[in-house]
């Protein structure tokens, strides 16, 4: 029941503005990095190890030494704050609102807060495409993968520990997991661990996303075909799966060349219909986010309680 309540709280309220675990995790990563940084694989491994232990050990101790009621409150708060359904919707909707007002400059600025690519040179179509890509990818990273590790951890009595460990790795990847001069070696373990941890959730979650969105597809057979043919068309081993699911549902073209920190990466395209992307396409992507997240929650609860 606590999993369901935490999920619903996130849907209604969204992320807490104060005392958010991710802010604490991010600040801790910065402090450890400042202390041990050298662009070496071993130092990057230590960053990963120390950050996980700093958070997981106290949670495990609290689980085993405090009253059950106190731990349940902590558990509820952690789950609620680490599932990002509402915040993903809320932050990306700001870009949509700017597009509705034809304020491209503001849309590019707001988009830069939710993607890691350079948004300064994007046109309206590219903004819409980037928005759909980030919603689809973060449906996995921000919702489905956390639920997956929550369920997996519950089977071994370490649900919160595994959820927090996943979010730490995910945060590390977003902060140091780049193939640039500074982080090529130092961020290697964080990036690779994130790839491994998302491997199963990306595949299961993308299938759930595809099934959730087939109602909105004009050609179900074609949607499935696009997904199957394009799911590996990404430099990341996982990002192509949710993007291919959405590209199949909407019958649009995603991915392609993108600029990150001054470097242009020539990615393969996902999908082949180069039609204009509309705001309605983004609305459908939101529906897939909410439907697939809800379905996955029910699947997760079924796994935990053996339904």
Please provide the spans of the model-predicted regions:
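Hydrophobic alpha-helical transmembrane segments
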Residues: 1-165, 169, 177-307
């Amino acid at each position: 029941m606590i999993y369901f309540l935490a999920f619903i709280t996130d849907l209604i309220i969204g992320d807490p503005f104060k005392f958010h675990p991710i802010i604490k995790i991010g600040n801790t990563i910065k402090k450890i990095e400042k202390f041990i940084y050298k662009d070496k694989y071993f130092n990057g491994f230590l960053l990963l190890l120390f950050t996980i232990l700093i958070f997981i050990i106290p949670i495990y101790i609290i689980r085993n030494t405090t009253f059950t009621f106190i731990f349940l409150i902590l558990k509820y708060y952690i789950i609620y704050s680490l599932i990002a359904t509402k915040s993903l919707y809320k932050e990306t909707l700001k870009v949509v609102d700017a597009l509705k007002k034809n304020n491209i400059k503001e849309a590019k600025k707001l988009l830069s807060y939710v993607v890691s690519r350079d948004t300064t040179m994007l046109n309206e179509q590219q903004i819409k495409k980037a928005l759909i890509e980030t919603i689809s990818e973060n449906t996995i990273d921000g919702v489905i993968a956390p639920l997956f590790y929550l369920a997996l951890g519950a089977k071994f009595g370490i649900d919160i520990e595994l959820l927090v460990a996943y979010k730490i790795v995910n945060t590390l990847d977003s902060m140091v997991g780049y193939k640039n001069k500074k982080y090529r070696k130092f961020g290697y373990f964080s990036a690779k661990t994130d790839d491994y941890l998302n491997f199963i959730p990306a595949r299961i979650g993308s299938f759930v996303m595809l099934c959730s969105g087939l109602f909105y597809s004009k050609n179900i057979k074609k949607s499935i075909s696009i997904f199957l043919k394009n799911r590996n068309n990404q430099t990341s081993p996982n990002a192509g799966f949710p993007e291919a699911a959405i590209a199949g549902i909407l019958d649009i073209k995603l991915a392609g060349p993108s600029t990150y920190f001054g470097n242009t990466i020539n990615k393969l395209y996902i999908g082949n219909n180069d039609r204009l992307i509309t705001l309605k396409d983004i609305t459908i992507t939101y529906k897939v986010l909410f439907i697939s997240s809800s379905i996955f929650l029910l699947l997760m609860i079924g796994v935990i309680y053996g339904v």
